Amino acid sequence: MVSPPTIRTRRARWVVLVAASSLCIGSVVAAPASAEPVYPDITDGLVHHFELNETSGTVVANTGTAGAGADGILVNPDRAARGADGIRFNPDDYADALSGAYVRLPDDLTAGMQAVTVDYDIWIDPANVGEHQIWSLGNKTSCDVAGGQQGQLFSSNTQRLRVAAGTVNVQQNRVRLPEGVWKHVTYTQSPNANGTTWTGTLFVDGVQQAQSATITTAPSVNAAGTNCNFLGRSQVPGNYSFRGTLSDFRVYDRSLSGAEVVARAAQGNDEGAEADAAAIDLGLTSAVVEDIELPKLGTVAGSAITWESSDPSVVEVVTPPSATSARKVPILGVITRPALGADDATAILTATLRKGSESVAVREMTITVPAEFDEAHSVDRDALDLELHSTDNVRGNIELPNQGRWGSTIVWESSSEYVSSSGEVTRPAYGHPEVEATLTATLAKGGAEVQKNFDVVIKPLPREEENERYFLGYFKGEGMADGEQIMFATSNGNNALDWTGLTGGWPSLVSQLGDQGLRDPHIVRSPDGDTFYMIATDLNWYDQGGYAINDTQYIEVFESNDLVNWTPQRHVKVAPDDAGNAFAPESLWVEEIGAYAVFWAQSLWNDPVNRTGQGNAQMWYNTTRDFQTFSEPKVWQNPAPQSRIDTTAIKVGDEYYRVTKNEAGNAGSDIFSEKNADFLDSDINAWELVAPALGRTTWQSTAGYEGPVIFEANAGDTACPGQFYLWGDRYTNGGGYQAACEANIEAQTWQAKTITMTNAGVPRPRHGTVLPITLREWNSIRGIPNEDVATTVDIAVDDVRADQDAEVTATVAAEDGFEVGGEVRFTAGDWSETVYLEDGTASVTIPARLPEGEQSVKAEFLGFDILLESEAEASFQVLPAVAASVAVTDRCVAGRVLLVVTATNDDERKVSLLIETPFGAKPVGALASGKTHAAVFTTRAASIPSGTLTVAVAAGDGSDRVQSVYTVDYGAMSCS
């Protein structure tokens, strides 16, 4: 959330701000004055005065002559922030006119007035969007329903700053109040000589912006008075509620003179210019080594800034031409550095700031320009500039530069096998812990060398799940006030033809940078699956007056790990300086280079200084691993003198297929497909033409198509199973996106399908992206709780000999059939070990020497993430270390019992025996595998009681010698 800087007309605050900033990088020079300026208030005719500075409650005090009986009421106060600088309406989210915060003003606010002045301070939130009204006075049969309007007087900043008096708009076409800065606005309406019409004049910072002398709606709006009077709310319930701050709102029952309007704005202009001067930040001015981009406007109050240099041989100010076509070209401070070994040079940059017609502030900043770097300085500066992004959340390959801006060679080393010295990342498996590593950069130039370490945290892989739903990012179109912002929708079931908008057609993301428009959003999922990068065109056709005025080399970048929470917008320059635009950017993961290719349409100016003579449209590209650092742009498709734009791409097997628009003009434009095994091949003749006219052969032969989307249907898709989808934006004859399916990616004509959109704001979305997603992702996006997943454990263990380790494997399965990860704890007796699952299984070795006989082992899956705990237990036999069979029989000789012990070697090894009985012991030196030895023991008795004997069976020698003792019970024996 962007908060307005403190700027209200309280001079002490300004002085503190100016003084504090002056200590940093320069000084603010005010015009000489003998004393503090005096700003007399204008109170003559001030009927309603709402300072809007209450810090609590819902009453908005009226300190004008109308008094407390005409106080206002803050409605929906939980959606407002109150403070000494005004009421901040809807700082956190969007709302319609009824549910958002607004002030209800008293009825009949301007009753009986033949002239009126409305005067206030305003800070418009950069997130403000859509049809809205800043203030409005109306007469309606019911304020909270559409229709029934009997007259209205209101102001808005939609498309342009305007005041509407009945059917007349007082406006200067396409001039809007700048957002994120404080402005003073005044509207006066005075009767003309004929007594039946009025002249309305609109001022910003005391300077006239627009005027109309043909107004037929009186300041009183309606003879019956007004019953729907608001601050921050529209007369139309379905409009947006205003987002921004209003302060010091005044209504006079007369038209202030031009001099009075200037006087009303004077204090804010003076203090605003000083605050803008104090807020200028040129960075490290004590060591400037590259050209500086100098601001044109103040960041607090929007003052216009011009620049001069005391020494152009050190810092030359290069101001772009005043032509409208070049208005986006920045002012540059071009640096000339002293030669190696020379003294540092200095120059004073002077910024002159003007706000309104009379307020001027001056800021002087000393710029120190070091001499050309020697080797040591070059290395130190490259080390200072070297940075890596998101090092605590690594989820893909890392961009590791090998060359510094100042000529250093950079060599990298890694402390971990999980990240290579060239930045390729191998992530731990799902369910495994994150890995910490250190990347060490050694920067060297000549004999100078320095090292810089970066600690990184490599996150484990996400859970693999099957895609069962779809996600759509799109924009609505340039014909509506909120149409060029990003909207989201999700499929209804596993069907890429049936959709519901997430926010009822309201934007999910609003641009606050560049042109403050977001068109053509494209979303790419990382190859590991848990990072989403969204890029969009920096263009606001509706507010800026059409695409032809676009002159930006930037794209807008957002990043997410869940398609719900997005990083703040990044305004990223990708196109070269002489490009007139960077339209419809898309990206694709290119496995062969381990990075993303980012590609866009652009034209190059024939005259890059004045920004005139736009050439043919081409496709250019660069590469990136993180959408933070991009390679230098390169030509990808240049069909000169023809034009191409809007490429989308998909890889099928070993081939890359791209679908592109040929810019033949209106209905002659169509989309066509090509293929190549080398995605970055810039020889357009090396690409094989597959289908030359996909749009007009698939949908309507007389229409033009652009903005293609191509993607593979999910398994189980109910509309086009086992096929590919192709969407094309029919920008002529209306219609928006048209859809088609085909099993053959190389089909010349596809099967047309119908897209159904609900709560999307338009019947058909415009140029965007369809992204296959999992059911759990779909639930999270829609705000549906995801249930945890039950698991089961299956144990596999075989019987073992007492001298052998027992191998145990646990297989864990999830109830939903998708990937499992985490730890399994094995327990057998007093032994325990915990191991991680690998591909759904965990194996351990129970050490040998377990007691012979039946044993049990338990495997406990400890649960992980969404996976619930489970366990299982299994039994196994621990067999003797040496395998043998022992039998006991008896026979009688001469009336005496003979005990016969038979031992068989069941082992694979040769064994020795020691047979011990109550009647003696007999050793057997060697018994081959499979052989049997019988030993006879004479008892010398006619009968013997039951008893026990043992046979010790040994195998191996030395430390490898093992022995098993077989104990055999025998019954009583008798020869009688």
Residue ranges and their predicted role:
Residues A66-L98, V118-V129, Q149-T217, V236:
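Extracellular glycan-interaction surfaces
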Residues T43-V47, S56-V60, Y94-L161, A193-T199, ...:
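Extracellular glycan-recognition modules
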Residues P40-T43, R104-V118, R174-K183, S220-G225, ...:
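Extracellular/lumenal carbohydrate-interaction signature centered on repeated Trp-anchored short motifs
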Residues H432-P433, V457-D788:
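Carbohydrate-active catalytic/glycan-binding domains of CAZyme proteins
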Residues D93-Y94, G166-T167, S212, A223-S247, ...:
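Extracellular glycan-interaction patches encoded by glycine-rich segments
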Residues V15, E787-A881:
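Solvent-exposed beta-strand/loop surfaces, strongest in extracytoplasmic domains of secreted
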